[in-house]
Amino acid sequence: MSKIYPTDLTDNQWQYIEKTLLLEKRKRKHDLKEIFNGIFYLVKTGCQWRMLPKEYPKWELVYYYFRKWSFYEEFDLLLSSLRGIIRLKRGQNKEPSMGILDSQSTKWGNNKAPNNIDGNKKVKGIKRHVVVDKNGFLIAVMITVANIQIGRAHV
């Protein structure tokens, strides 16, 4: 399949992913590159799984691999590797020595969902805690109920 959408991987990008994740090279009905393209399309556009364009493999297959790779932290490995390469090119250590922590309260959920009230913001919902390095590259993310303060988040 040729490149159809702007989110589709180039051959060089795909070779890097294959090498980094040590993906098995065996005959498959659907190319893993097309499955990755489907995941990237979904992440970029925010569409629902069932609305994945027909140019990609069936949504169930793309979802299966997304869950599998998420469980085995393959995306974390890939992002960590890319972050290290860019940091080295900028003359920095491969791994960050410190991070910047911030949080944001968000309205979310219904009466049955685990949420609480952030006393400072007067928001009932959840709180996103994010750690980035000095370049703004993501290091860690954690979601808690809104009343957890940044010092207790243990991100």
Protein language model features and the residues they cover:
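Short alpha-helical elements
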Residues: M1-H154
